[in-house]
Amino acid sequence: MQKVSAIFTGVLAIVMVAGVAMFVGCQRDQGAIGLTGPAGSDGVAKCGTCHNVSTEVLAKQIQWSASVHATGGHFRSNSTACASCHTNEGFRATMDSGNMVAAPALIDNPTPPNCRTCHNIHQKYDLTDFVNSTTKPVKLMVSSTGATTNFDKGNLCANCHQPRLSKVTPYPTLNGDDLTIVANWGAQMASQAVILRGVGSGAFEIPGSVAYINSSHSTLVPNRCITCHMAPVRGDTAGGHTWKMTYLSSDGITENNYVAGCVACHTGLTSGVGKFDVNKVQTDVEGLIAQLKALLVTAKMLDTTTDRGLAGTFPSNKVGILMNYKLIEAEGSHGVHNPLFVKALLKNSIDYMKK
């Protein structure tokens, strides 16, 4: 009995000590209260700069979802050679490095060009997140003189909307040696920046009867690409973040030209079928393209049914003319971007091929 009592007394003592420690704690008396630190930022207010009751961001996302940037599907081209323009991740990486030729590595989980490609989304969490990710002048890769664009905000577009030098190697020189080229030689896509900048930008300016000068679209339109392709939006069909210049009528078949970005200069112009053919520019250019194509086919430099070239060895001047054809055909505006320059290239090229 005495033994049990001793055990009980010992356990009780341990419990009492533990209880005292629980309420008293092991720390000593606290020191003086320190100075109040700076107030933290209001997270709700910061996020609310963009995430608010406005539907502006949502509207632009909807426009983007209808754009070729979103639907083109080319972001599968995530290799080092293609990712710099076909994926968001590749573009940001090459822009940061200053080398737009190749991404540093194969892009895992690639995404198409999106908000984060052209803007600094979620970097400062304020309105500066919507500033263009770059507006620096862009060196044109096919220019032998190191020409750069001066498109202001449109410089962002010029980074990718230009042909790569690798596609026009060997590069033709005036009256140079014969050149051996492969079937896919030449600027086959995205030549807009070269045509828009015009004189001295990398096209083969073979001498001829027509002087090489630029049109007002090249020299006077502010921000170049942005003014026309991002004009006040028409729902999700044209302008704004669709970047589209055409839209379909309610029949789903008839294609209309969207001229909201043109009317500041071309007063009275209205959207509709064939409205870009001001002063018959497109009609004239399409006729000249057809003439030059026929001459290149006759010279066995171009496939008879496609715009794919034919491998072979040809005079340097004629190789340069083939480059002109591919630059203009791939550019897609049928002369609108720079009418005077394009007509000079075509007419002088045609005259030379007829010799």
What spans do the regions from the language model cover?
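Sec-dependent bacterial lipoprotein signal peptides
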Residues: 1-25
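Active-site lining segments that contact anionic ligands and/or coordinate catalytic metals
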Residues: 222-225, 257-262, 268, 318, ...
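Sequence context of c-type cytochrome heme-c attachment sites
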Residues: 26-152, 159-254, 328
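Hydrophobic, helix-length membrane anchors
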Residues: 239-284
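Divalent metal-coordination and catalytic microenvironments
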Residues: 64, 156, 265, 349
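Mature extracytoplasmic or organellar-lumen-exposed domains after removal of signal/transit peptides
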Residues: 267-355
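Compositionally biased, low-complexity segments enriched in small residues
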Residues: 5, 23, 29-32, 301
